[in-house]
Amino acid sequence: DASACNFDALATDNDGTCDYCSCFITTSDTEGYGVDVEVHAVDGVAGYTTYRVYATTASADDFVSAVTGFSGAPLEVQTTGTFFQSSIGGVTPSVVTDLLLGFVPDLAYDSWVTVGLDRKADSGMGEEDAATVSGVSPSWTVGFESGNDITINDGTGGGWYVLNSASNGIAGDDQRVLLGQFTTDGDLSGSMRIQVFPNGNSGMDLRYVASFGAPSCGCTDPDALNPDLDAAYDDGSCEYPGCTDSEADNYDAGADV
């Protein structure tokens, strides 16, 4: 099943191991361009999971310039919980250095937005820190730094970007560019309008919208104690009543409680 997280294009027979709940569902309105979401750390901050979101491109020399949103194509990065923000972190990782990480370990799990970097830019390598822009006051950055969602849906718009001279905007051999790190105690989802210059040509301005979210997983058995009527995939969490004592005459191997 091509929609499974562990889809194997070389497989000829379904062995029943398809997994639908360990990865994110992603969509894009442009073929060859999209987003990836990966788990970067679990419990780096107790009770939180750190995710990294990447733009994926069609070519290694594609240049990712900006992530934006406005009323016609909102930019949203949302959680059902809160985003962790380190006390010395920023909206971008421009303050992250080895020295500071040694003094403040939780800075490694700070939530931030970026283009291609997970620490302070190295100008000697042609790197540039991402800049942010907002069309309204207060800026979206204020709420985000307080642990809230990113939502940019006004008429003027906003987002983050790098100049064409920044080496960190180039996709490279893995054909992807880091767009953000988000540490949350909830479910992560979002939608981004991503600007790309195909093959590094700024005269070819491509803007695509990509979305991501966790699959709807839960107990799909209506006869279980904890059915989830909204779940699309069963994640093995169903609970069944019965005797759980293996020494008893009426032991039920399928019982949980």
Predicted regions and their residues:
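Primarily marks secretory-pathway-exposed extracellular/lumenal segments that are disulfide-
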Residues: 1-257
